[in-house]
Amino acid sequence: MPRARKGNTLRKGGQRRGGGARSSAQADSGSSDDEAASEARSTASECPSLLSTTAEDSLGGDVVDEQGQQEDLEEKLKEYVDCLTDKSAKTRQGALESLRLALASRLLPDFLLERRLTLADALEKCLKKGKGEEQALAAAVLGLLCVQLGPGPKGEELFHSLQPLLVSVLSDSTASPAARLHCASALGLGCYVAAADIQDLVSCLACLESVFSRFYGLGGSSTSPVVPASLHGLLSAALQAWALLLTICPSTQISHILDRQLPRLPQLLSSESVNLRIAAGETIALLFELARDLEEEFVYEDMEALCSVLRTLATDSNKYRAKADRRRQRSTFRAVLHSVEGGECEEEIVRFGFEVLYMDSWARHRIYAAFKEVLGSGMHHHLQNNELLRDIFGLGPVLLLDATALKACKVPRFEKHLYNAAAFKARTKARSRVRDKRADIL
């Protein structure tokens, strides 16, 4: 994608209200409480030499001899790449899963640059001739390759070579829903990172839009769409990938999309799938945010009806829904309703290492969630060391801290205990103000 376009969009969508990042003296190795764990997308291996537990441990273990460990890792990665062309489907799937783990947890740009053509050919065969899980894993690895290689000629070449296959699998109604789901995510992320031509962006938007638009009802926004349960995940992934690309879309395209999609998108709020309802709600909030960026006094004709639906979802107490789903839905739609009505997005803070990332817009939330989905537990490592992510989120150059600096930044245990105790007390007070005082009522 064009660097100027991405930079302008992110300043507009992510930092206009003071969002950004700054160094922090408080280390927090855990992830944000509200971050959802990525879905497991792996298969059991039939190739113990490639997918043993020791192989996985070597990808994320403590660094003892960094150079020696890097050499061992590269040797294993060479084996994985060689196994991508094995005759056994299970061996290929095992190699793809091992590559996925490695690319999510480490930065390997030099290794990948040397083998990008080999990897592109292997992934092309997996997407063309593979079935189901193999296609899904190949698409996931492609998305990670785009994150590793970043924007520029090499990343763009890789994306262009495999984009037609992603579109083909995604558009094939006979393909596995899991494969189509991962192709939708890879298409959105790859286009966001590597596409430099506006026509690539427009074509990817159209392809993703066609996936969820075909399930709109025929009777207007009040008609519930009929979506097979097996396709709920696919529609959620396509909608989220489409929303990701909206964050870099030119204003002229945004205007057409608002006219075409905003009146119809609320239909998905009545879906039986909580994930699809949440994806639709967050996308609606993003569309309102983009619309108000274009026109400060933006007015939506069916505002009252939309807010009524959002309010119902924000207070849903149906017992037939799982408690965790109800809690997640209410939390999300309270934020969506607040944003649609008042135009403000609740700020979220993500701490990693000695740094802090502030997210104060729906555009920034969507971008973070897209990378989090593919990187999983490796998200913090990439935020600290991946120049692409640091550029996108405005984190500046990679911090180089020696042992002395690390020791100086480390907070004493007693001070950390006092800070956590004060934060816990403040959080308890804040929550108690909005809880139902049933004892007082009785």
Curated annotation (Swiss-Prot):
One GO term of the biological process aspect: adipose tissue development
Any GO CC annotation of this UniProt entry: nucleus
Spans annotated as Disordered: 1-71
Keyword annotations of the record: Translation regulation
Biased composition (Polar residues): 43-56
Tissue distribution of the protein: Expressed in many tissues including heart, brain, placenta, lung, liver, skeletal muscle, kidney and pancreas.
Family per similarity comment: Belongs to the IFRD family.
Function: Ribosome-binding protein that acts as an inhibitor of mRNA translation by promoting ribosome inactivation. Associates with the P- and E-sites of the ribosome and inserts a C-terminal helix into the mRNA exit channel to preclude translation.
Subunit structure: Associates with ribosomes; promoting ribosome inactivation.
Protein name per UniProt: Interferon-related developmental regulator 2
Name of the encoding gene: IFRD2
